[in-house]
Amino acid sequence: MSDFSPREIVSELDRHIVGQGKAKRAVAIALRNRWRRQQLQGHMREEVLPKNILMIGPTGVGKTEISRRLARLAGAPFLKVEATKFTEVGYVGRDVEQIIRDLVEVGIGLVREQKRKDVQARAHLAAEERVLDALVGANSSSTTRDAFRKKLRAGELDEKEVEIEVQAGAQGMPMFEIPGMPGAQMGAVSLGDMLGKAFGGRTKARRVLVKDAHPLLLTEEADKLIDQEATTQEAIYAVENNGIVFLDEIDKIAQREGRSGADVSREGVQRDLLPLIEGTTVSTKHGPVKTDHILFIASGAFHVSKPSDLLPELQGRLPIRVELEALTRADFVRILTETEASLVKQSVALMGTEGVTLDISPDAVEAIADVAVEVNSTVENIGARRLQTVMERVLDELSFTAPDRSGETVSIDAAYVRERVADLAKNADLSRFIL
């Protein structure tokens, strides 16, 4: 769990996302409160519950991007899901408890990766011994092994092919649902899980280069040194206390006014979400998981429906409400130039791989922003995503001919941009911009 201060979290988000200060502050405070709760002891620690967040704002203003960046910052089990993917319990489809099962798998992956780093030195030596066994045999003399070990570490044997024994494992085994046992009880059952012990001791021979053998064996040796039971328990603890779920497209499951009749992917899903967000115990194949202290961040554009169309109980379980503002022309210019991996920087880097030096002038950036604003206002406002479409149109010809122009420097100014998107700016052909 990261211990960034709210100011540091906002500063980190500012590197990638323009504007939306209120939303950044809300998620920063929520993330810091996770750390604060960990510092409490005993009864008070159990009593402090997370304040779940509802982010409201038009499409393309940064709701999903905030969640993506937050996941990297959190250092905690984090899962982003679309609310529209779930159906009411009892119907065909995924029920909402699958969210927690998926979150546990994310947690196990995080903890296992950390434990692999902890045992990396020992695993490295064990993997090296297995490569030496493949090169000179298990019964070779220590003198021979030492000589080959030096060559191996010097990289002299990298291109030599060896045959190694690796775990056959049960990966790739099919998944199936047990009839009469819906996901609420156990979820999809993997044959690999059921037959894991039977397959656990099986190995298969593979012929690989020495340089490729070491990474393969390193992961295998690290997993041998890890206590899998302890890993699972640690992961469940991390999920229960630090887990974060980002529920996107929550507006799509709101029951709109004037509609009646059953809809298994709308109100039923909201009802199923209530206990999950309030706090319940979900059965997983790794054991029961309590959701009381999992933080839920919901977001939606609410173009057609309103937040008040959600069930009142669900609204009450999302007490912190943040509205994100629509982006302006000035925001578009900043998105193109100031963010760490802006579209301009990405385009320059991509053309650089072809040996083409791309120079996009400031007035070209202004022109791209102008076109994006104009098309957003006349067709459909899809926010910052419009910039990607305009940028692709501007660079379309160059992207196609770049392999033939290696060594050239291509300058793009406002006139070049207007020439490429002239028909679009005049509303002559907007079909390419309707996503």
UniProtKB/Swiss-Prot annotation:
Q: Which InterPro entries match?
A: AAA+_ATPase, ATP-dep_Clp_protease_ClpX, ATPase_AAA_core, Clp_ATPase_C, HslU, P-loop_NTPase
Q: Which molecular function terms from Gene Ontology are attached?
A: ATP binding; ATP hydrolysis activity; peptidase activity; proteasome-activating activity
Q: Which Pfam families match?
A: AAA (PF00004), AAA_2 (PF07724)
Q: Cellular component per GO?
A: HslUV protease complex
Alphabetized, the UniProt keywords read:
ATP-binding, Chaperone, Cytoplasm, Nucleotide-binding, Stress response
| Binding annotation for ATP | 18, 60-65, 248, 313, 385
Q: Where is the signal peptide?
A: none
- What subcellular compartments does it reside in? Cytoplasm
Biological processes annotated in GO = protein unfolding; proteolysis involved in protein catabolic process
The lineage's top-level taxon is: Bacteria
Q: Which HAMAP family match?
A: HslU
PANTHER family assigned:
ATP-DEPENDENT CLP PROTEASE ATP-BINDING SUBUNIT CLPX-LIKE, MITOCHONDRIAL-RELATED, ATP-DEPENDENT PROTEASE ATPASE SUBUNIT HSLU
Homology family: Belongs to the ClpX chaperone family. HslU subfamily.
NCBIfam families, per the entry: hslU (TIGR00390), PRK05201.1 (NF003544)
**Assembly description:** A double ring-shaped homohexamer of HslV is capped on each side by a ring-shaped HslU homohexamer. The assembly of the HslU/HslV complex is dependent on binding of ATP.
Per the entry, what this protein does is: ATPase subunit of a proteasome-like degradation complex; this subunit has chaperone activity. The binding of ATP and its subsequent hydrolysis by HslU are essential for unfolding of protein substrates subsequently hydrolyzed by HslV. HslU recognizes the N-terminal part of its protein substrates and unfolds these before they are guided to HslV for hydrolysis.
Protein's UniProt name: ATP-dependent protease ATPase subunit HslU
* Annotated source species: Azorhizobium caulinodans (strain ATCC 43989 / DSM 5975 / JCM 20966 / LMG 6465 / NBRC 14845 / NCIMB 13405 / ORS 571)
**What is the gene name?**
hslU
